[in-house]
Design a protein with these regions (language model features):
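Extracellular glycan-targeting catalytic surfaces
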Residues: 20-164, 169, 173, 196-199, ...
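Aromatic-anchored, glycine/proline-accented short structural segments
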Residues: 185-236, 240-241
Length: 331
């Protein structure tokens, strides 16, 4: 009997190992052809990063449009995206130079940045720390950094995951990526629950994110003569974060794609795909809609859901807003 039980345990382990081997995870098993060349990583190795002691950004929008960001805000955003590219380059190529440069960037900000002094700067932490955290997740096994992990712990107070808006969607991604960077299983579990909660609260049964579709391109966020001109853009922006979060959760033990929340997400996927393919069906259609094709995240959703409209858009290939380099993933 004891031998039989041991045999069953052995078979279970074998099946689990084989299942993992057969599963091609989007990020964990990221494959790409010539990614270092396509992202000009060798040039990025020589670029100098200028971290700041404080972030003091003014509001992103004015009464007439988008404000030009200050030097420190530009540097923080550039650093986040560059560290991600370099870390992804390391993940794909195992070139240590890329991993070391990514860690150099992360540690520079961890050491220098001391204060976040405006609401807009808090927003920027919420929106860009996910790139930095994912960069660290890609390289931490080879290049662990207690300094950067302490930085994450300091910055987590600025997560906006409690909000049921695009800010909340990105806050959830901030939390998920923090959990992976810190090996914080409790935070990952809570984030999985919050992911589902956000979807049910932010996306209605028709797949519409009401807080997104009315967005204008001025500080009159949901009104004025351009009400809705960024409605599809902000829908895309929120769904991008929810999609990346969903994939990271999936790759780390929380398969929510087929859950009730996942099914609601699939409705939103098809809804926004229909709007993008036929913009005149968008409730706030107007000439010069902004950010309509910011839908590179469809590449991930297409692996889990079916949408004829999305399939057509993927076939056309006009996919933008690809800071996570999803288009470079080999099939």
């Amino acid at each position: 009997m004891k031998r039989f039980v041991l045999f069953l345990l052995f078979m279970c382990v074998c099946v689990c190992v084989q299942a993992h081997a057969d599963q091609d995870y989007f990020f964990r098993d990221f494959k790409s052809t010539d990614l270092p060349q396509k992202l000009h990583l060798d040039k990025k190795l020589s670029q100098t990063i200028q971290p700041c002691v404080q972030l003091n950004a003014s509001k992103h929008y004015t009464s007439t449009g988008v404000r030009e960001p200050d030097a420190c805000t530009k540097s923080f955003k550039k650093s986040a995206l560059m560290s991600y590219d370099l870390a992804l380059g390391y993940l794909v190529s195992k070139n240590k130079q890329y991993g070391l440069k990514a860690i150099e960037i992360l540690n520079a900000w961890a050491k220098e940045l001391q204060s976040i002094d405006t609401y807009q700067s808090e927003d920027n932490i919420n929106f860009y720390m996910p790139y930095m955290n994912m960069a660290y997740w890609f390289v931490k096994k080879a290049f662990p950094s207690p300094e950067y992990e302490d930085f994450i712990k300091r910055m987590r107070q600025y997560s906006q995951s409690a909000l049921n808006t695009n800010h909340g969607a990105w806050g959830i991604l901030f939390d998920v990526s923090s959990a992976l960077a810190l090996d914080d299983h409790a935070l990952l579990h809570n984030s999985a629950n919050r992911w589902q909660d956000w979807i049910f609260k932010a996306i209605d049964e028709n797949g519409v994110i009401a807080s997104a579709i009315t967005r204008s391109d001025t500080s009159d966020y949901h009104g004025g003569p351009t009400k809705g001109i960024k409605g599809i853009a902000y829908t895309n922006f929120a769904l991008l974060a929810i999609t990346i979060s969903g994939e990271l959760l999936f790759e780390n033990g929380y398969d929510l794609w087929g859950s009730g929340a996942g099914k609601r997400l699939s409705v939103a996927y098809n809804k926004v795909a229909t709007w993008i393919l036929n913009p005149e069906t968008f409730p706030y259609f107007q000439p010069n809609l902004i950010g309509v094709h910011n839908n590179a995240y469809f590449i991930i959703l297409a692996k889990h859901y079916s949408s004829p409209s999305a399939d057509e858009l993927l076939k056309q290939g006009d996919l933008h807003e690809d800071g996570f380099r999803l288009k470079l993933r080999s099939l």
